[in-house]
């Protein structure tokens, strides 16, 4: 989904489950475990055709290329249906069989498919959120595979100079000095449980001031660059983190809901396969760190590199294709 919609979802729509997400999880530092199993196969095995879809922004297209290329390298015929639109278009497409595979975000997808939280609610623990998401996907004939350490969720960043001068690596480092710092973010941030309010309640951080800006966009980036703010709200996979050498502070007390990246696959496709498809897609998640995702996003969004070439280079670097 587009970044603007994603931030609004994180700050507003998902806020209704905040009371159920009180930092009891293990965070997003380790990859998840799906129920899919892999079976070694001979090269002569006939592979099912696969349609890989994506929403309409660069990160999704790159993830779609990662999935497509690793499958193609292992004998699958892949059709790409990228740039389909937002989740309101893509989710019905995978449920109806117009596409077979797409990259998703655990907490956001769970909040979307189970809007009232009657089956499960997103939490700050990726494994618990994955389990809840699978329960919500079961009636739809879909399976969520292993999640990556990489996320696309709210994050708080500082400049390299600020991080070095104040020894900042994680959000809890802000607590003793928060009253000397200015926070920047969307105007609603002071009242939101995953923004300034959450930083106060979870970390005990009280800032000297708050500067209303935009939803993780150019105003926040410019304010950080121009030293108008000390801490800014961006997405954890924002390409400016690499391009500007910002430091993403670790959410060490797990304030944010677990929006780890994971492939979602139609069961009808998995049932035609021998486990190889799930194993191949899971191998991507096992190596996709936050730094690796952010670097690819920077190459595509800032350097204007081709998503297909960026994905191929990453897969080769990781030893996943030749």
Residues covered by each model-derived region:
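Bilobed "Venus flytrap"/periplasmic-binding protein-like clamshell domains
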Residues: 47-79, 84, 149-221, 305-309
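Periplasmic-binding protein-like
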Residues: 141-142, 148-152, 214, 237-284
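Alpha-to-beta junction loops
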Residues: 95-104, 178-181, 220-234
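Bacterial lipoprotein signal-peptidase II cleavage site
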Residues: 18-35
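Beta->alpha turn/N-cap motifs
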Residues: 86-87, 97-110, 129-130, 159, ...
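An extracytoplasmic/periplasmic, membrane-proximal ligand-sensing/linker region
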Residues: 59, 192, 200, 205, ...
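A conserved helix-loop-strand patch within extracytoplasmic ligand-binding domains
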Residues: 123-183, 267, 286-290
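Ligand-binding "clamshell"
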Residues: 113-123, 130-145, 228, 240-254
